[in-house]
Amino acid sequence: MLLSELSHPNQLHGLTVSQLEEIACQIRERHLQVVSTSGGHLGPGLGVVELTLALYQTLDLDFDKVVWDVGHQGYPHKLITGRFSQFDSLRQQNGVAGYLKRSESKFDHFGAGHASTSISAALGMAIARDRKGENYKCVAVIGDGALTGGMALEAINHAGHLPNTPLVVVLNDNDMSISPPVGALSSYLNKVRVSPPLQFLSDSVQESVKNIPLIGKDIPEELKNIKGSVRRLSVPKVGAVFEELGFTYMGPIEGHDIANLIKTFNAAHKLKRPVLVHVVTTKGKGYPYAEADQVGYHAQSAFDLTTGKSIPSKKPKPVSYSKIFGQTLLKICEQDSKVIGITAAMATGTGLDILQKNIPDQYIDVGIAEQHAVTLAAGMSCDGLKPVVAIYSTFLQRAFDQLIHDVGIQNLPVSFVLDRAGIVGADGPTHQGQYDISYMRSIPNFVLMAPKDESELQRMLITSINHNGPTALRIPRGSGLGVAVMDEGWEPMNIGEAEILEEGEDILIIAYGSMVASAIETAKILKNMNINACIVNARFVKPLDKNLIMPLASRIQKVVTMEEGTLIGGFGSAIVELFNDNEINIPVYRIGIPDVLVDHASPDQSKEKLGLLPDQMADKIIKKFKLVI
């Protein structure tokens, strides 16, 4: 059977192992062909091809539910659930999403882009099933990296307390999340992964399953036949943690052996209780370059399939903001041993990998644990250290309570660097960094800032570290503007001080962060129409530079704000509140992201759809204020 002929996963039923292995090869071929052309997540999907095929042969997906954690692993799922022909449009505007999305397919039972949610969602579905008196199966597939997340452990703790609630958790253990996983649980899984194979069940488990009506007497024999794959369920140090938490543990299982996977999953479904199936896979399986560099090939831009090398862009790009941040922080750390860089499983993405390589004593990776990262930093700051927490804007949302309770209320000197702030592109609504201005502006004691270019990033970073209170510095995804940076001697900024970039009397444009460059381009368009704009680089949204902004606004009387974030509670709202509090009655036109979810597309396509390109903004300003050309 050909993969292209699959329109429904139930078509896998009845296929031989040999046929499934043939489809596995086709999935990898299609996966590699598309990702090498347009970019996307590579290693995770390649590692779960056999797991996906085996699992789906044991399920009826017209009824049964499967929740994939994060969605990095979801490409094989998409290819066998009717999206083969559309797969060329992966992560492109109006195309197939890079993550599972309920609105895209009835087989995407739960959407996700953030880690550690799958067990909670699948357990919720299982509880709903039991309350309705139905009998469909509920399965969560979670990676070993995501399993370190607190939410996943909370769900395991809850599920284990419900012994009569059938739930299968498949642990896809490839010893790798995005970066190598960290922590005691990861170390424990390493020990389990290399433990000697045992081919029999514990007496206690055999006795318990024999009591299951009708089928119980057959299960132990069926499990015994999974030769060389299932290791003893209750031997100390092999699955003991999960069994103590109320799960029946099965594994470790070879994750690329379809026949044994099918037997194991069928046996797990029959147990009718919480079961954890530990499957050991190889991230990037089937593509040697991805197997050899599992971090680098987690996600890739377009690359040459033959050499594995990225296809260089036609025009060289400036260094990314993330790298400038990492390089600058390294220099600061070398000068001050009290400065500590903290990341939550995103060392490479945030630029902190340079600390990991050069000064590991001043680098901490807490794993997928944003809440812990924030409060860890709070505790460190109490005793004289200077923590710098680098987290994607979208992931810091997960630690909102800690920002308030553990940092803001106590006014602790913790520096937060929010990477991927603003529009991020192809990862879609789960990853857009559009909310941080709004949610952080409400927290007392915080200073919020955003640079217009690389040089300001360096100055703001040293300002943050020197400030005796909490700060948040947002930086956009991707390349900088090509502005020269310094290796040392960065001049701290005055907190709350804005700057005038261009003088003008017809319109006042106050821009924040990444939108400053767009404001300058917009002003050029307006100037060609004989409209002279005064441009202010706000630098800070909290506190605002009242002494600069209010006199300018009072004089010019027409104000435009620009931000790459949600308008609700954002930078523009702060300006409106400033004027209202000071009884200044001046019209303010706010330009930013309206109350919508920003779908997957390139950043420029998203900005065009939102009306955030310079020519669009110039046109909006002219129409809003009825400016005479």
From Swiss-Prot:
The keyword Metal-binding applies. Keywords: Isoprene biosynthesis, Magnesium, Metal-binding, Thiamine biosynthesis, Thiamine pyrophosphate, Transferase. GO terms for molecular function: 1-deoxy-D-xylulose-5-phosphate synthase activity; magnesium ion binding; thiamine pyrophosphate binding. GO terms for biological process: 1-deoxy-D-xylulose 5-phosphate biosynthetic process; isopentenyl diphosphate biosynthetic process, methylerythritol 4-phosphate pathway; terpenoid biosynthetic process; thiamine biosynthetic process. Its EC number is 2.2.1.7. Gene3D superfamilies: 3.40.50.920, 3.40.50.970. It is an enzyme of class 2 (transferase). It catalyses: D-glyceraldehyde 3-phosphate + pyruvate + H(+) = 1-deoxy-D-xylulose 5-phosphate + CO2. SMART domains: Transket_pyr (SM00861). Thiamine diphosphate binds at residues 72, 113-115, 145-146, 174, 287, 370. Disulfide bonds: none annotated. Pathway: Metabolic intermediate biosynthesis; 1-deoxy-D-xylulose 5-phosphate biosynthesis; 1-deoxy-D-xylulose 5-phosphate from D-glyceraldehyde 3-phosphate and pyruvate: step 1/1. Binds 1 Mg(2+) ion per subunit. Binds 1 thiamine pyrophosphate per subunit. GO terms for cellular component: cytosol. It comes from the Bacteria. InterPro entries: Dxylulose-5-P_synthase, THDP-binding, Transketo_C/PFOR_II, Transketolase-like_Pyr-bd, Transketolase_BS, Transketolase_C, Transketolase_CS. NCBIfam families: dxs, PRK05444.2-2. Belongs to the transketolase family. DXPS subfamily. This is 1-deoxy-D-xylulose-5-phosphate synthase. It comes from Prochlorococcus marinus (strain AS9601). The gene is dxs.
